[in-house]
Amino acid sequence: MKLRPRDVISYEGHDYVVEGVLTYKLNGKSQALARAVDDEKVLWVEPMVGDSDDRVVVFREVQDLTLGTPPPTTIAYRSGSYVPRFSGNAQVTVDGLIADRPAGACDVWRYRAAGDLYLQIERWPHKTVTLAGESVHKDMLEILPAP
């Protein structure tokens, strides 16, 4: 599943328009994260990597978890205990318009907890962002390609 600007993602009764897609190049791998918006609701969607995948990670930016960087080795958040999955300095490219995420370097820390729950902490030159999300089956989303 490749997401592009202006695609529409239907999820949980809302239609989100993809404003842009960030591609993180980290540890020899590329990982995409699409910013999708429905009025004031914002999702960050990590599409499946390959045809054999059947899960998509859906993130939301959170304000109730304040962490320094680098973050600790274990994070307790919303009754989950998160452990590191990967981290490093990523080179980020932007396709579309994402005002507060410029192309360039960003430090990234990804954590995982039981129940396919995830945290992603990003340290940009101008701010630190925390995303919390969960892995959902691909059939929970409907993707309508941009015209």
Give the predicted meaning of each segment.
Residues 1-147:
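Mixed-charge, low-complexity intrinsically disordered regions
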